[in-house]
Amino acid sequence: MSRVKKATKADNGKATPTIQLPIDVNFILALDLSLNATGYCRHRLDSGETDYGVIESNGKRGIERLDAIVGRVRGLLGEDPGAGKPVCKLSTLVVIENYAFAKANQAHQIGELHGVVRYELWKQGLPYLLIAPMQNKKWITGQGNSDKNLVLKELMKRYGFDVNDDNIADAIGLMTLTKAVLGKWEHPLVAFQKEVVSKVLEATAS
């Protein structure tokens, strides 16, 4: 069963991670949260089925925009409106690309978006994993400071996903990285991939 633990203080004085990786993951939802175009990727480990796309804000602003994005995330988790519970609740892991503020005047708005999405996951009892943007880029390209064009190119070359939207590309990168972290990646890892996986595992170690 998926496990979530509270943050505590480790012997070295640093806070330990707020989650432990679930032991029975079968469904990954990866999110590259954005105010205008949130990239997502869903993957079932048992069947290999994958889909991806973009959650667009469609001109909405403020609370209305936050509510619309959270609603779409809820839908992507397979929630049955009648039962009010996600179909895959006990086997789901959500992975989110952590904060990266491109525009200073949007920092608080992006923070609000991350907050309401994480609150929704908390309400549903779903664990989530945070991946730094530079870790995700390094996983995809081998370089943590890669531009969007290189990310798109290397995603096709290394992982076989031909997309033309960088938000979707980031979400697919998160999904494939999470598979590797869970030990479910089907191919041998090269040195830089091993390094990224090791860093993520260190951050989630109990």
Per-region residue spans from a language model:
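Phosphate- and other anionic-substrate recognition elements at nucleic-acid/protein interfaces
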Residues: M1-S206
